[in-house]
Amino acid sequence: MKITRSRCLILSFVLVCGLVPEVTADVEEATDGLSTTQEPIWLTDVPATVELIAAAEVAVIGFFQDLEIPIVSVFRSMARQFQDVSFGISNHSEVLTHYNVTSNSICLFRLVDDQQLHLNAEDIENLDAAKLSRFIHVNNLHWVTEYSPMIAAGLFNTMVQTHLLLMMKKTSPEYEESMRRYREAAKLFQGQILFVLVDSGKRENGKVMSYFKLKESQLPALAIYESVDDKWDTLPIAEVTVEKVRGFCEGFLKGLLQRDHEAEGDSGKEEL
């Protein structure tokens, strides 16, 4: 199957740039809804730091030689903003040495693709709350990550090139059980496929469904694609099960496609 390269560019445009105003709205909404309870965990030794990182899908650690610099208070505020991220902070030499820290730095540890993303001293020097919030938003990828334009930017910035989308309404009675199974399936493809939820109940997500030529009547459905290639496929499903998701993913990775998109032509391609 061959789809033109322009279609890959259209996909990235639809996912990342199609709803730019909402990116700002996401940050503002999260900032407005800060919790006053969560604080970073003070890490005084290596075992505690290792344990925190290992137990979290996403962990952000502030390694600071100087706790008086302005970014420290900004960092602490992030822990109140991102409730699904584990935050730690340390200025202990043993911890800094273990992680090869030679200057103030912030590191995001991510389980789903076993990645470590660093903001070094030079980055931190010009960092403010908005920039740090965006860094965490973009890279906050979990076993299952809910789609947003900002998250899409992170998806296209990862080493994992195959992404699976589950398109269904979060208000569906089957949502909770479907997500449990979807998450279970995601763990089978760590480092191979990133799993994403697209809430089809949001009108603004209609462009994502249109790109994959899916109608409301076909949902829930799976859509899978490679971010740097021309391969993609879809599978409407009446019920989300681990077996169905695993079979669809394994088939795609082996080059087995459910639909012949070449035969469909480019009639469904959107020029945005």
From Swiss-Prot:
Residue span(s) of domain Thioredoxin: 39-152
Signal peptide region: 1-25
Subcellular location: Endoplasmic reticulum lumen
Parts forming coiled coils: none
Gene Ontology biological process: response to unfolded protein
Assigned keywords, A-Z: Endoplasmic reticulum, Glycoprotein, Signal, Unfolded protein response
GO cellular component terms given for this protein: endoplasmic reticulum lumen
Keyword Glycoprotein: yes
Chain span(s) of sequence motif Prevents secretion from ER: 269-272
Record keyword Signal present: yes
InterPro entries linked: Thioredoxin-like_sf
Pfam families assigned: Thioredoxin_6 (PF13848)
Region (PDIA3-binding site): 230-233
Glycosylation sites: 91, 100
Described purpose of this protein according to its UniProt entry: Specifically binds unfolded proteins and may recruit protein disulfide isomerase PDIA3 to unfolded substrates. Binds protein substrates via a hydrophobic pocket in the C-terminal domain. May play a role in the unfolded stress response.
Subunit structure, interactors included: Interacts with PDIA3.
Protein family per UniProt: Belongs to the protein disulfide isomerase family.
Protein name as annotated: Endoplasmic reticulum resident protein 27
Gene name for this UniProt entry: Erp27
